[in-house]
Amino acid sequence: MAVKSIKVKLRLDDMPEIRAGLWKLHKEVNAGVRYYTEWLSLLRQENLYRRSPNGDGEQECDKTAEECKAELLERLRARQVENGHRGPAGSDDELLQLARQLYELLVPQAIGAKGDAQQIARKFLSPLADKDAVGGLGIAKAGNKPRWVRMREAGEPGWEEEKEKAETRKSADRTADVLRALADFGLKPLMRVYTDSEMSSVEWKPLRKGQAVRTWDRDMFQQAIERMMSWESWNQRVGQEYAKLVEQKNRFEQKNFVGQEHLVHLVNQLQQDMKEASPGLESKEQTAHYVTGRALRGSDKVFEKWGKLAPDAPFDLYDAEIKNVQRRNTRRFGSHDLFAKLAEPEYQALWREDASFLTRYAVYNSILRKLNHAKMFATFTLPDATAHPIWTRFDKLGGNLHQYTFLFNEFGERRHAIRFHKLLKVENGVAREVDDVTVPISMSEQLDNLLPRDPNEPIALYFRDYGAEQHFTGEFGGAKIQCRRDQLAHMHRRRGARDVYLNVSVRVQSQSEARGERRPPYAAVFRLVGDNHRAFVHFDKLSDYLAEHPDDGKLGSEGLLSGLRVMSVDLGLRTSASISVFRVARKDELKPNSKGRVPFFFPIKGNDNLVAVHERSQLLKLPGETESKDLRAIREERQRTLRQLRTQLAYLRLLVRCGSEDVGRRERSWAKLIEQPVDAANHMTPDWREAFENELQKLKSLHGICSDKEWMDAVYESVRRVWRHMGKQVRDWRKDVRSGERPKIRGYAKDVVGGNSIEQIEYLERQYKFLKSWSFFGKVSGQVIRAEKGSRFAITLREHIDHAKEDRLKKLADRIIMEALGYVYALDERGKGKWVAKYPPCQLILLEELSEYQFNNDRPPSENNQLMQWSHRGVFQELINQAQVHDLLVGTMYAAFSSRFDARTGAPGIRCRRVPARCTQEHNPEPFPWWLNKFVVEHTLDACPLRADDLIPTGEGEIFVSPFSAEEGDFHQIHADLNAAQNLQQRLWSDFDISQIRLRCDWGEVDGELVLIPRLTGKRTADSYSNKVFYTNTGVTYYERERGKKRRKVFAQEKLSEEEAELLVEADEAREKSVVLMRDPSGIINRGNWTRQKEFWSMVNQRIEGYLVKQIRSRVPLQDSACENTGDI
């Protein structure tokens, strides 16, 4: 069954004694779970680690194993005395060994086994807390009969085998032995239950006859076991991941730095020098001074230019080459400070001896950085009612715990209530346990989807969903009482919780479950593998399935058993998602339309008579992603305001560095500051720019003629004055942002400025980052300002961002589900919207698998990073949760290079941006975007005959351009995200493998000839290339041939994680030990031959870029064009 969670607010304004009782119950439950967790942690007898109180993310030992053993022995000896034991007390080692055995029974995850916390809690709590309990000893006659007994009584065959299995399990179970040993040593009972201990201040109701422990204690004990089980599993995973990183580090060192120990020592010395020169780096993280790939961007060009200079050449010559490269690649350039250090004679060996060394060491540093952040042990945290709360649980009617009942319309229409069968009530300062408390709940639209099903069965209900024509059957599940976490920190100021909620779970049956089926029938056609649900098709089952379930075109969810359709989804940034729907059909159904065009389709592997026919493709837009002139103006204005403040802060930070004690750093910063035209970027407010320029003029008059102390004091005073000036701007900006209009979103068609778009979330993130940088800005070079422990800096904005992300994920997942079911959101004549069935439904939703995006030249890194951070993972999980009740399958497909090849032709291409209309106007006050200005300058388009919507190849953008044929000027254009969605379909139906377009090869010798040997990183690659090698005559194009009958085994690197494999690949590529080959399946680029990756994409770029440039140059130049404006943004 699918589980839905509905959070309702309890109306407690007129029930102060119940409000206080709920808060008291919350504290008691947390204290009780803490009590039992402490017992379990002592029985474990191993080190416990907590977060360091310094707030630096490090760990420290909270309690050593010896301290745990000492405290445990103290408790055990005290228990023997309290129990009046007069028999053998046992040695310390015997008691500790017995305690550990008990722990492994309670928490089997400690020894790598599995167990059910509910069953363990019910099995052990009574024997451990009641001296008369006989549970677990194998002699109790109460409880359910064994399964083999029930089978024998029912006359079912196989009961003898089941009995044998039960006896085998019983003989292997050490429970009885451990419990008897505890009794022999006078340790029964081992502990008092929490509700009977001196720690509890509640007047609990007396136990019923035959009741050994209260349900409150049973749930507390169960939650403590659940926490320890989860913690033990996590602790093992953390240790394994740490060991893997250590092994990865050692393997990388052995493979890359043997024989270069002197260079390793030198680069460590370089990093130490940079650390000492910039103490502020350590305020971010301990590895902030490490050499990174980002800091080395452009190093190949810089080192090439430097190689022509003498080692003892003046620094000015080296610095000039740095600036030349930086000027040509402003957005693809690394750290000027790092290059300046590398130009010093003592560090030149790092790039003169081996130009690839620093690149490889940057990869190595990425491993060290992960190792530095990794933990060897999981952090152990005890429950706390305010800091680390757990929630009080209730069971449905008829359950094993304290129960609740949902009362429909108890106080009128839509005015529901909750009846708690047991609760606490505080009167005159005394908390007492009471029975049957009815609490009204606030109205909620979510509750309107619940309808009572049977008055004789209070837990039975109907669940209404807009994605189904009929109601789903369901039942109430468990529930939790929850408080708002932001209010818990202030509970010491009040006696009770302010806002209290009940989180109710509802178990809903899908259509297939209602028919008595475990899965829908089409689930047999697809295979979903692993946690990522990688999708594969059982091609041999397609024909039989379609014969049993012919396509009759039913619309909406009623058509799920009609035909077979797949909807692929490409998540984007500009629009939330792009979808493409394909239907499995017979090939003879493909009929040309009135224009003679055959429908777009993909062949299906192994099925000559079946094809996947394209039905529809479209963009899914959420509120905030629609475009209009007015909306764009508002969005650009608020971005421009924030961009001005960020630019001013960047200049202010550069001015601070001009006052550094390090002379070299100071002079480089000063040179950089005065060389940059302050007003050219047009990213500052005029008044602040004027104030800043005035301070620069004052400093220019002092530079070079005053002492270091006077210069640093002058810089500090200048910083302080412009910082104060900017402070007023920041305050005014914050005031405007807080008072800005926030339009309410209803439906999917409303135009709003922000809405649920990623652009809006990124804008909020940039606000937060700017405020953080501004609040912790140091006015003295090297000054480090950190947030105080427990700081709630910009907590409201942070919560707003988190809620915006959660809201986007849920809305996007809901929209994808409805689109897959064939529903569209339509407005009636009154403007009221509702979901209407318009298309036949899809049985499978296919997402791109982004976790394997390890290739540097695939999707733009910035775009992939934004999707990976939270959006894709969150949508995937939310889709799985929502799709289950609708019987929809959710899978993923290998997505590497799906945005770089045309789905129709297979040809590679480039993503392009359109020229903005404003850049073609006669009098354009705004500068060109940086990408357009770069294109114009590179191709010397002085006359700039640009038109609106001209395509500019940038590698980013929403238009994908690829060659359509080998003929010159024959190109295909399509929306890039729609193309990526269609590529996922092509890969699904063709059983795609990456080796069809990309191969990693190593240099080697075969029969005395230097050849490329394919790296067999998987079974598919091994099947195709285990006995093949590649040779070349040009060093660019490679041809394959067989190397003999002997087939090689799969490459050992298959055992590595894909991330580690790609790290090793990057290092090999830097040393030219391996080569990546690409090919064009369409045969257009280099006739479809295998080509070195760099040259392959160069051929693609030259072909498309040349065509687009030729188109622009073929026009009549526009006179006095505004295109001479070459500003940059």
Swiss-Prot record:
Region WED-I (OBD-I) domain, residue ranges: 1-14
InterPro entries: C2c1_helical_1st, C2c1_helical_2nd, C2c1_Nuc-II, C2c1_RuvC-like, C2c1_WED-II, Cas12b_endonuclease
Region Nuc-II domain: start-end pairs: 994-1129
Region called Bridge helix domain, residue ranges: 629-658
Region described as Binds sgRNA: spans on this chain: 4-9, 442-446, 742-746, 753-754, 792-796, 800-819, 835-839, 973-978
GO terms of molecular function: DNA binding; endonuclease activity; RNA binding
CC cofactor: a divalent metal cation
Active site positions, chain numbering: D570, E848, D977
Region entry Binds non-target ssDNA, spans: 573-574, 897-900
Binding locations of phosphate: S899, R911
Annotated segments matching region RuvC-I domain: 519-628
Pfam family, one: C2c1_helical_1st
Annotated region (Binds DNA protospacer adjacent motif (PAM) on target DNA), positions in chain: 118-122, 143-144
Cofactor binding note from Swiss-Prot or TrEMBL: Optimal in vitro activity occurs in the presence of Mg(2+), but there is weak activity in its absence. A more complete study shows a preference for Mn(2+), although activity is seen with Mg(2+) and Ca(2+) also.
EC number: 3.1.-.-
Site (Binds DNA protospacer adjacent motif (PAM) on target DNA): N400
GO biological process terms, semicolon-separated: defense response to virus
Outcome of substituting R507A: Greatly reduces cleavage of target DNA
Residue ranges, annotated region (Nuc-I domain): 901-974
REC2 (Helical-II) domain: annotated segments: 659-784
Annotated region (RuvC-II domain), positions in chain: 785-900
Annotated stretches, region: WED-II (OBD-II) domain: 387-518
Recorded domain comment: Structures show 2 discontinuous REC (recognition, residues 15-386, 658-784) and NUC (nuclease, residues 1-14, 387-658 and 785-1129) lobes composed of several domains each; the boundaries given correspond to Lui et al., but Yang et al., differ only by a few residues in most cases. The crRNA (or single guide, sgRNA) binds in a central channel between the 2 lobes. PAM recognition is sequence specific and occurs mostly via interaction with the REC1 (helical-1) and WED-II (OBD-II) domains. The sgRNA-target DNA heteroduplex binds primarily to the REC lobe in a sequence-independent manner.
Remarks, miscellaneous: Part of a type V-B CRISPR-Cas system.
Oligomeric form and interacting partners: Monomer.
Protein name from the UniProt record: CRISPR-associated endonuclease Cas12b
Species: Alicyclobacillus acidoterrestris (strain ATCC 49025 / DSM 3922 / CIP 106132 / NCIMB 13137 / GD3B)
